Amino acid sequence: MSSKKSLVQSLFNISKTYSRISGLTRMRPTKSGGIPPDAGDSGIRRRFLHKRAFFSPEIVPKGGNLMEKLRELTLSNNNRIRLDEMLPPPSPKKSSPEFFPAVTVEDVKKLMRAAEMELVKSKLREIGKNWVPYSEFVRVCGEYSSDPEQGNRVANMLDEAGNVIVLGKLVCLKPEELTSAMAGLIPTLEPSLDAETRQEFEQLEIIKSDIDKRADDLVRKELWAGLGLIMAQTVGFFRLTFWELSWDVMEPICFYVTSTYFMAGYAFFLRTSKEPSFEGFYKSRFETKQKRLIKMLDFDIDRFTKLQKMHRPNLTKSGRC
């Protein structure tokens, strides 16, 4: 009898210990969906019948215990520190160079025209000829379009862009060869020869400017002398009119002197083909003095004119040599 009591007491202690551990792992006891416990059964019997094994494996709880475990995990996940939220916000993605905005209808048309032009150029290069008739050229330009007017439009675009050269009824498909041939016909000066002629031109230009200055001084001296003669003539006629003679005598004299001046001006015009004026008289006398100085100094005016056209073709020519 005593052995039975000791066995029951040890079983009771073991059941009490494991029930305490299971109470910590569960928030509430699960309600058994089976037959309700008998009120007459003793607590020792229930604990003995429902006690757990000493080394029971971890079994996933079912029913309400599973829901409670999931709820506990959810609460623990909400309360934990989220390191991903502490990270700085991601930098905005920069638009890559390969990204293109929306293409408009005009852009599509432009791309189509460019592609058509490239196809026509490749087709023209495949011909292998330098010159083709204009009709064949238009036909090739319109091969990639159903519209017959498109060929004329593409042909005009190629002509304006300089890809071909249209000369009448012929079309040059290789304009670079034509331009190189034309450039070969244009004479060019070598750099060394050009430097030598420029230096020679500068020396001749200095001499020419000195001749022009000397001729201008001589002409102005003549003009001042002419002014003195006119003033002396006016003073002499004034004295003869009011002191020596009378107006009746001086009137025909003044008339004939004036007629002489008119005839001299007319003769000047016939000889120089210039207007008989002070400016015309100055230019005529300047050219005369200039030619005289050029001859006296043995200045090569023809060489100077040639070099002037070579190095200063846009120089405006004056009345002087």
From Swiss-Prot:
Top-level taxon: Eukaryota
User: What residue range does the UniProt record give for the transit peptide?
Assistant: 1-56
Write down the species.
Answer: Arabidopsis thaliana
Keyword vocabulary terms for this entry: Calcium, Calcium channel, Calcium transport, Chloroplast, Ion channel, Ion transport, Membrane, Metal-binding, Plastid, Transit peptide, Transmembrane, Transmembrane helix, Transport
The protein's name in its UniProt record = Chloroplastic calcium uniporter protein
Choose any GO biological process term that the UniProt entry carries and state it: mitochondrial calcium ion homeostasis
Main localization category: plastid
Q: Which InterPro entries match?
A: MCU_C (IPR006769), MCU_fam (IPR039055)
Family designation = Belongs to the MCU (TC 1.A.77) family.
Provide the transmembrane region boundaries.
223-243, 249-269
Q: What happens when the gene is disrupted?
A: Plants are drought resistant and recover quickly following rewatering.
What is this entry's stated membrane topology?
Multi-pass membrane protein
Query: What is a single molecular function from GO for this protein?
Result: calcium channel activity
Which gene is this protein's source? MCU6
